[in-house]
């Protein structure tokens, strides 16, 4: 490791005119070489403070910062830090550089660092990232975190479909047409696609917990208003507010997965993260039908209010902050606004035991105004767009079946509203089956490709996957499932057309739910792989495409079945989905090259941002220098005036005596 650190230091550019540090020399620095030491023996935490607050100017500064973070988790480790030759200590050398202004000293390169100890040496870069734990949470704890995030995303699709059975009753109570009451469904889906664009970018910078808090506060308030209102205009406005609050949590589930799970095991976790959004549309009509059958339709929203409140209490007490920009791998104590009860207990326990609490994040994140344009930028990336289009079409296919089932089973098989609601159970069973099976298939295929390439897959460790065929590994699982789902859709349509036994559609609905839901999950895994660290943002883009295409499919399926019949209507929908699959094949072939090109572009952008920051810093330093020079000149003038006045005052008594 020492050789790698020295190599990085040797690549550094000249030291700036002043070394910036935000605190004096830590007390844990110990002089081990006499009055003029060549190095100091420091603790792990002091080493991190040193590399964090001395502003190294070289391209590998982020790697050194990351090294300091990882050293905190290596036991029995000490660090020898070699300071500048003229230094009496880190803080002393800083002050000396400011006072002397020695040109040679200002150009001196950043100090070398060597690391020694009982810990196994690792390389900076690929080796270092491979050996570093990706998350401090155990496997069981990570599963609970993802399950909680999935349940939080369950409320949006639940609220979208739960009052479908009550639409005729609500229209009769408000004395409006069916078209007007259906407008509340359309507006809900539109807001459901837009709201995550705002919350996703906010959560990627400020943290997941503040974003969840805002979403659920809005959602609870909207449910309370909907349970109490009896006006069509209020229903329309509050449904939009309900959609904005609940749908914001959809994108956060995959963001949580990207925070704590590596690509090697991401398939299983994202399958569970998608479970809530899959079960919502399938189970909610059953719940809504039962409530409408035996209670007043207002109780739909009372049920949502009580259910959500019961969920939120343990969720906000124990759900930890996972955003890597705030807590890193989970070992850093987050700011107060991001802390759960367990964070407070952990910090209190560490203080009582005499252990210093974990350091705050390397750079405390500022609360930023949510920018929906950051989500729209996802569509500008070609590989992402080629994945989003087939994924959205597949979701539209699923919604076409979901929406058309209500009227189809009522007209063809003569079912009442309660029986129609029970027909959605096979869709829910298929969704559960996909969550239990898809992740294992995805992870197994990942390991198969890794074995072919001679790569050892390690759990909860970062690995360099720049040359790994991620697209091929994911799509080899997803595409066959999608083909099977579209084939079942064609058969489903013609069975309804010929009015065969109801058991045929029931079985096909279960298979379609399993295959299409599994395809959604595979696409989610691939998209999160494409945008590491921005899982919430890319999921918001996915949600936008799916909701809008789902709304379109829900709107056109009824006219299509009335015009050409169920057989040709669902055949056309299946053919549209099948026609988009060449985009995925093209992505599988060119995915590695596209990721490399994207990484190079990001590197250039990062260099440009750093150059801009450096230019702004130098400009501020010049302004401060001019300001200090001007202030000094004014002080000199003022001192000169005072000296003249003193001389005049001293001459006045002499003149009086002479007189």
Swiss-Prot record:
UniProt main location, coarse: membrane
Residue numbers spanned by region Disordered: 1-42, 76-127, 605-659
Transmembrane segment boundaries: 144-164, 183-203, 210-230, 235-257, 269-289, 299-319, 385-405, 422-442, 475-495, 502-522, 549-569, 572-592
GO cellular component: plasma membrane
Disulfide bonds: none
Lineage top rank: taxon: Eukaryota
Residue ranges that the Swiss-Prot or TrEMBL entry lists as coiled coil: none
Glycosylation sites: 182, 338
Basic and acidic residues: compositionally biased ranges: 93-109, 605-634, 641-651
Described function: MFS-type transporter; part of the gene cluster that mediates the biosynthesis of the antihypercholesterolemic agents phomoidrides which are dimeric anhydrides.
Protein name in UniProt: MFS-type transporter phiD
Organism: Fungal sp. (strain ATCC 74256)
